[in-house]
Amino acid sequence: MGDPRKPRKKWSPPGHPWVKERLIEEMKLMGEYGLRNKREIWIAAAMLRRYRHRARELLALPAEVREKEEKALLKRLYDLGLVDENATLDDVLSLTVRDLLERRLQTVVYKKGLAKSIYHARQLVTHGHIAINGRRVTSPGYIVRRDEEELIGYAPTSPYFKKAQQ
């Protein structure tokens, strides 16, 4: 059976806590994307850091070795909707936290017009009114894949679903 793995943090706080420019930028992101706390920004930054680190590792490899892994990384990022179909590793290195926050379920629900505000979108998601392909998703930080984008709608058991049907 084995021992269960120890759950680890998916984020790391900034190195210095009181850098004014970073604090201002984080507050702007929190307001623009309706985030509850800065940890949500740090989680997105950590995820992005992992992708960018992988891209830098691949750039250091010889061309014939990196080709297969480069395609896999670019396909993964394309499926997440972070890069275009004909993207390069330089495009991966130029990704920002803002690009990743645009792919959160909360943001996509607001951009699709299912919610009146970004905060309303968060409430709809957490209260179980939003479903992807008929399956209820209650995490506003869920990263929406490219193929799931058009499948987002109200959950069948939601009162909003009944209003939308009329």
From Swiss-Prot:
Residue stretches making up the S4 RNA-binding domain: 103-165
An individual GO BP term: ribosomal small subunit biogenesis
UniProt keyword DNA repair, yes or no: no
Keywords per UniProt: Ribonucleoprotein, Ribosomal protein, RNA-binding, rRNA-binding
Entry GO CC: small ribosomal subunit
GO molecular function (one): structural constituent of ribosome
Gene3D superfamilies on file: RNA-binding S4 domain
PROSITE patterns, sorted: RIBOSOMAL_S4, S4
HAMAP family linked to this entry: Ribosomal_uS4_A (MF_01306_A)
Quaternary structure note: Part of the 30S ribosomal subunit. Contacts protein S5. The interaction surface between S4 and S5 is involved in control of translational fidelity.
Role according to the record: One of the primary rRNA binding proteins, it binds directly to 16S rRNA where it nucleates assembly of the body of the 30S subunit.
Family statement drawn from the similarity comment of this UniProt entry: Belongs to the universal ribosomal protein uS4 family.
Protein known as: Small ribosomal subunit protein uS4
Native organism taxonomy: Archaea, Thermoproteota, Thermoprotei, Desulfurococcales, Desulfurococcaceae
